[in-house]
């Protein structure tokens, strides 16, 4: 009967161990899945870059092709936001697993930190690609306008695209030749493309702000945990010193008690000896 009770008592510990193993397995599976999505995201970034290079080289008179490129960028940003949300959720769950110098807690924090750094690197490269594509597209528009004897600066082009007045610059252009018509369509599509690109770049900037907050939050969590670990070590060391001091004081107290007892015994013997001699001197026959 006692054996059965013992087995039942041990069951919760085994169950907790199994739950911990399952939790760690789920965490690692989630990390692998996010890592796979990051690999796909990196490949998409490169594919978008190649599409932009092709667009700059071949022209953008085909509206459908420009729309396809913009849709690809929108899907990329949406996927990046989804990964960011998953990493934010994973970071919040880390509060349940305090970090230490070794162990699964440390491993969890390091895995999430590496994923955040990977996403940040991909998005940083993507932002550079978008800025470069925007600059090259603006140059294409400026080149077209100069061919039509319309001199404009890059800042004027940027301002005209942003406020929608770019087409006012082209109202006097003669489009009687089909080639000129194609060039104008290319410029018009690029201008529309740049306006969409501006919106996408702002979305990427917002995503970067969210990621910086996530990195900061992750860093603060790590700092708090590191501080707690350091304080715990300091408290443990102080406790050991207190124990050692208590042992030393206890030994000293015991030593002084023994010395005090011996001194009292010696003093008592001296008093008895002196009292015996004193009584022998005043009382005849006293020994």
UniProtKB/Swiss-Prot annotation:
What keywords are annotated for this sequence in UniProt?
Coiled coil, Membrane, Neurotransmitter transport, Transmembrane, Transmembrane helix, Transport
GO MF terms, alphabetically ordered = SNAP receptor activity; SNARE binding
What superkingdom does the record give?
Answer: Eukaryota
Primary location recorded for the protein, binned into one broad class:
membrane
- Give yes or no: UniProt keyword Coiled coil: yes
Record-linked Gene3D superfamilies: 1.20.5.110, 1.20.58.70
Q: Which residues form a coiled coil?
A: 65-97
Recorded GO cellular component terms are: cleavage furrow; cortical granule; endomembrane system; perinuclear region of cytoplasm; plasma membrane; presynapse; SNARE complex
Q: How does it sit in the membrane?
A: Single-pass type IV membrane protein
Q: Which residues cross the membrane?
A: 263-283
**Which locations, inside or outside the cell, does it occupy?**
Membrane
Stated name of the protein: Putative syntaxin-4
């Amino acid at each position: 009967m006692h054996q059965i009770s013992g087995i039942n008592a041990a069951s919760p510990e085994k169950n907790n161990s199994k739950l911990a193993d399952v939790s760690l397995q789920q965490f690692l599976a989630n990390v692998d899945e996010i890592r796979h999505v990051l690999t796909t995201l990196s490949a998409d970034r490169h594919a978008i870059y190649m599409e932009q290079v092709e667009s700059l080289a071949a022209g953008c008179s085909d509206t459908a092709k420009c729309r396809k490129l913009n849709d690809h960028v929108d899907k990329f940003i949406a996927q990046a936001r989804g990964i960011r949300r998953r990493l934010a959720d994973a970071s919040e769950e880390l509060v349940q697993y305090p970090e230490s110098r070794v162990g699964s807690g440390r491993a969890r924090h390091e895995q999430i930190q590496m994923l955040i750094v990977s996403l940040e690197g991909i998005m940083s490269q993507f932002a550079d690609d978008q800025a470069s594509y925007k600059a090259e597209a603006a140059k294409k528009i400026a080149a077209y306008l100069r061919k039509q004897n319309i001199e404009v600066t890059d800042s004027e082009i940027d301002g005209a695209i942003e406020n929608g007045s770019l087409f006012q610059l082209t109202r006097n252009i003669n489009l009687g030749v089909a080639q000129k018509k194609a060039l104008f369509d290319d410029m018009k599509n690029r201008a529309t493309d740049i306006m969409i690109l501006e919106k996408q770049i702002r979305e990427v900037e917002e995503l970067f702000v969210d990621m910086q907050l996530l990195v900061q939050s992750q860093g603060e969590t790590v700092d708090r945990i590191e501080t707690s670990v350091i304080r715990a070590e300091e408290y443990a060391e102080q406790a050991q010193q207190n124990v050692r001091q208590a042992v030393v004081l206890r030994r000293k107290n015991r030593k002084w008690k023994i010395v005090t007892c011996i001194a009292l015994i010696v003093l008592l013997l001296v008093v008895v000896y002196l009292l015996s001699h004193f009584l022998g001197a005043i009382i005849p026959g006293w020994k």
